[in-house]
């Protein structure tokens, strides 16, 4: 589902004859917006073994405490990145050249999705580490389906901004469902 979600937008952009220059700008925006999730990935890698161990020991309160603490830590460490990527998106894109300025709104939209991703914290790791991998798989497919459907409807009219919106909404939906499931 992750591969589908990360490939569908580019495939649908190309299928709708969005120019290769705009597809390149979109991919640059997705790569830059993922900077905001770098801390999430790093912390998740270190937290998952501890969560698995505590869950196996049925220490559910400690699992919850670590999940909440890591979510807060990830969010607050990521705030400066969010401020830069959203508040100064034109300047960030300008670093790649004047032709990339067209991607400033796209970058901001994608970064909003990453904000929610970090706020939700290690939800995927919690589901996988606690034996709910089938539920996580289903949630992932749900997110991929939302991504594809939104891309099909939004890209023809809104181009890369539509793809960014589809990406952000599917990421938000995926994270919110994971959070409520936990």
List the predicted regions and their residue ranges.
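Residue-level recognition of pore/gate-forming positions within transmembrane alpha-helices
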Residues: 3, 31-34, 82, 114, ...
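Short helix-kink/termination motifs in transmembrane helices of multi-pass secondary transporters
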Residues: 3-12, 42-46, 70, 74, ...
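Helix-terminus/linker motif at the lipid-water interface of multi-pass membrane proteins
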Residues: 3-35, 53-54, 90-98, 157
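Interfacial segments at transmembrane-helix termini and the short loops linking adjacent helices
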Residues: 20-22, 68, 85-115
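Interfacial transmembrane-helix starts/ends
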Residues: 27, 59-88, 104-107
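Helix-loop junctions and terminal segments of transmembrane helices
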Residues: 29-59, 64-71, 124-129
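Membrane-interface helix-loop junctions in multi-pass transport and translocation proteins
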Residues: 89, 93, 104, 131-134, ...
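Membrane-interface junctions at transmembrane-helix termini in multi-pass inner-membrane proteins
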Residues: 111-142, 182
């Amino acid at each position: 589902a992750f591969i589908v979600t990360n490939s569908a937008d580019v495939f649908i952009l190309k299928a709708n004859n969005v120019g290769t220059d705009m597809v390149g700008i979109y991919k640059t925006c997705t790569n830059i917006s993922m900077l905001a999730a770098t801390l999430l990935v790093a912390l998740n890698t270190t937290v998952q073994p501890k969560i698995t161990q505590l869950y196996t020991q049925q220490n559910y309160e400690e699992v919850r405490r670590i999940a909440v603490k890591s979510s807060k830590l990830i969010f607050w460490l990521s705030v400066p990145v969010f401020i830069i990527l959203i508040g100064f998106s034109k300047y960030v894109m300008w670093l790649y050249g004047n032709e990339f300025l067209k991607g400033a709104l796209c970058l901001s939209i994608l970064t909003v999705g990453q904000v929610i991703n970090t706020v939700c914290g290690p939800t995927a790791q919690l589901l996988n580490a606690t034996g709910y991998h089938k539920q996580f798989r289903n949630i992932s497919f749900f997110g991929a389906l939302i991504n594809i459907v939104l891309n099909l409807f939004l890209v023809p009219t809104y181009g890369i901004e539509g793809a960014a919106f589809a990406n952000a909404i599917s990421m938000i939906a995926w994270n919110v469902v994971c959070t409520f499931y936990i």
